[in-house]
């Protein structure tokens, strides 16, 4: 259609005055876009999928919800009104049916990560997190997979992780004894140090000194910032920002963060390659990966190392800190449950190990229920159907559509969960979990599922188990500070994570 229109314009303007030609081109452009909008809205296969009338014509309402930090609530409200399959934009659909969501994410699925994920790369190349090509993702994941198994983590890293967590908890305990201590900040430092140590042997002393690794500091300027949002939704403003960044320091920090991050990342590469040459594979995940990929097409370049380090830090730090913060808030809001948990972890005889913690039924039920309601990634996980489209949930999804699934809805759907909005850890106790319906099993995926399941699922769970055990052993009787309220802890959808509104949660040991 576009080619035919172009030919018609060229024929119509041949020999015509310039003003007439420009006016005709402008009119044709407007007409073409109007026809495209109407065709997509009312004649696409997506027209059969229910949704608000305006979503067929524009994604402005959806975009507004992203900037307002309430996309998960907006999309969930559409599911409440229109059902498990809802059209949320001209070429975007959200799926809340557990079986259909499983089809989108299962092993061997025909759906791939949507172009949106290119924005989430901290570097100029694709990384372990955002590869759209399944083969390339599989090759890269294979380089890291062994280092992230539970067996390897316990064997090589549990001691380091335990010491780091213990130190963070002691810092909280010292502060809480004299006033308020802020949980999310300490959990973030803890998670930063653990991931830095594991990936590139960095981050030493992060918790002890209360100062993040330089690479992490630069990465945070790159993460989920205004530049990412503008590049995705309003590209012209992104390029204006790049120009202004040449003369304004603050704008430079935002719009040139990638370049600065790579400068700070030189130490990551140096550490990885030095440890590889020294054979210190247990001390550096990237050293292991370099060894695994030596002589192979999948071997890592310096750019790959920095970009993957950034991706692993983003995926491995904030989610753990956020999840622990919400979990402790939920427990401290329920004094009787707090006492039960304190008694369970106090019953540990001897050293606190992950093997022991994995066998604590109450603690693990609390962890799962907190992640059901307040998982760190409640928002959409956009995917693209294959060439030629695909059938999903009783509808045909054409090529070029974005298909989302969001845990905020899957984890709180009343059709799947009894008293879905209520925190009830007992549903995850071993005897009750055995009674889970197939629908519940498909719906509960706080770490994702299929071949794109979180690479650090075992690390995340190990950290949470040890952190919860240490915290409630050392800070027995801790209470929420006055600043920690339901309002301050309301979930805000911050583009890639669900965070407390005030981005903090204070507790105290003082009477």
Swiss-Prot record:
Inducing or repressing factors: Expression is positively regulated by the dothistromin-specific transcription factor aflR. Dothistromin biosynthetic proteins are co-regulated, showing a high level of expression at ealy exponential phase with a subsequent decline in older cultures.
Binding site for heme: 454
Organism: Dothistroma septosporum (strain NZE10 / CBS 128990)
Cellular localisation: Membrane
Keywords: Glycoprotein, Heme, Iron, Membrane, Metal-binding, Monooxygenase, Oxidoreductase, Transmembrane, Transmembrane helix
Glycosylation sites: 162, 407
Name of this chain's protein: Cytochrome P450 monooxygenase cypX
Cofactors demanded by this protein: heme
Pathway(s) it belongs to: Mycotoxin biosynthesis
InterPro entries on file: Cyt_P450, Cyt_P450_CS, Cyt_P450_E_grp-I, Cyt_P450_sf, Cytochrome_P450_monoxygenase
Family as reported in the entry's similarity comment: Belongs to the cytochrome P450 family.
EC number: 1.-.-.-
TM annotation in the entry: 18-38
SUPFAM superfamilies tied to this protein: Cytochrome P450 (SSF48264)
Tree of life domain: Eukaryota
Signal peptide from the UniProt entry: none
């Amino acid at each position: 259609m576009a080619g035919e229109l172009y030919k018609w314009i060229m024929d119509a303007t041949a020999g015509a005055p310039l003003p007439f030609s420009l006016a005709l081109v402008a009119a044709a452009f407007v007409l073409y876009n109007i026809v495209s909008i109407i065709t997509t809205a009312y004649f696409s296969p997506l027209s059969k999928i229910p949704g608000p009338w305006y979503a067929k014509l524009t994604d402005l309402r959806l975009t507004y919800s992203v900037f307002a930090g309430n996309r998960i609530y907006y999309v969930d409200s559409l599911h409440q009104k229109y059902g498990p399959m809802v059209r949320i934009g001209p070429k975007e659909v959200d799926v809340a049916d557990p079986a259909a969501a499983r089809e989108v994410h299962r092993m061997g699925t025909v759906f791939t990560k949507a172009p949106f994920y290119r924005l989430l790369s901290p570097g100029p190349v694709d990384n372990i997190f955002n590869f759209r090509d399944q083969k390339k993702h599989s090759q890269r994941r294979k380089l890291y997979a062994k280092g992230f198994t539970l067996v390897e983590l316990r064997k090589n890293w549990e001691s380091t992780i335990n010491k780091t967590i213990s130190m963070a908890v002691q810092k909280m305990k010292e502060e809480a004894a004299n006033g308020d201590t802020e949980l999310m900040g300490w959990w973030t430092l803890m998670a930063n140090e653990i991931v830095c140590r594991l990936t590139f042997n960095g981050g030493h002393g992060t918790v002890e000194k209360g100062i993040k690794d330089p690479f992490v500091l630069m990465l945070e300027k790159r993460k989920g910032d205004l530049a990412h949002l503008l590049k995705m939704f309003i590209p012209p403003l992104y390029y204006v920002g790049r120009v202004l960044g040449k003369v304004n320091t603050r704008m430079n920090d935002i719009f040139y963060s990638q370049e600065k991050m790579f400068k700070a990342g030189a130490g990551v590469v140096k550490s990885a390659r030095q440890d590889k040459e020294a054979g210190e594979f247990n001390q550096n995940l990237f050293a292991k990966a370099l060894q695994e990929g030596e002589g192979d097409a999948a071997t890592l370049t310096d750019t790959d190392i920095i970009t993957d380090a950034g991706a692993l830090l983003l995926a491995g730090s904030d989610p753990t800190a956020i999840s622990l913060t919400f979990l402790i808030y939920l427990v401290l809001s329920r004094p009787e449950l707090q006492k039960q948990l304190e008694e369970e972890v106090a019953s540990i005889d001897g050293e606190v190990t992950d093997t022991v913690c994995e066998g604590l039924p109450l603690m693990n039920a609390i962890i799962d229920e907190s992640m059901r309601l307040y998982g760190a990634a409640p928002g959409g996980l956009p995917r693209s159907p294959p060439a030629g489209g695909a059938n999903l949930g009783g509808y045909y999804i054409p090529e070029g559509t974005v298909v989302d699934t969001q845990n905020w809805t899957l984890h709180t759907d009343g059709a799947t969960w009894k008293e879905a909005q209520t925190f009830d850890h007992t549903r995850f106790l071993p005897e009750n979990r055995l009674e889970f319906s197939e629908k519940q099993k498909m719906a509960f995926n706080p770490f994702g599922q299929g071949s794109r399941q979180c690479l650090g699922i075992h690390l995340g769970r190990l950290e949470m188990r040890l952190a919860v055990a240490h915290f409630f052993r050392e800070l027995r009787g801790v209470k929420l500070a006055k600043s920690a309220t339901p309002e301050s802890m309301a979930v805000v959808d911050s583009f890639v994570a669900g965070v407390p509104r005030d981005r903090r949660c204070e507790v105290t040991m003082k009477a």
